[in-house]
């Protein structure tokens, strides 16, 4: 699944809420360099089996919103190097903005007052 949508320059909104990714191990660069992508709906998208999510949203320079549900979870040993590198317009659901110090999976969570993140809660 890695690089599946890389460089899809014509995409602005992507809804893959119903993709079954429960057994996918490589998600590296999956959305990388999608320069015009602004919104992604991930819904039931699962990264629990993922070993590689590096560069997942790298160079998504127009990306503002990533919607996920409460089940989105990244395992501790997953390689998330540069997951959000240069996704400079991203804003979490509680207003957290891109910070170059957090380009790995540290902020790959729903943005709340207590826990800053780059994701927005997707309504069911």
What residue ranges belong to the model's regions?
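Polar, enzyme-active/binding microenvironments
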Residues: 80-83, 119-121
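Register-specific detector for alpha-helical tandem repeat solenoids, activating on a conserved position
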Residues: 2-3, 28-29, 54-55, 81-82
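A recurrent domain-boundary module in secreted/ectodomain proteins
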Residues: 108-124
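Structural signature of tandem-repeat unit edges
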Residues: 9-25, 35-51, 61-77, 89-107
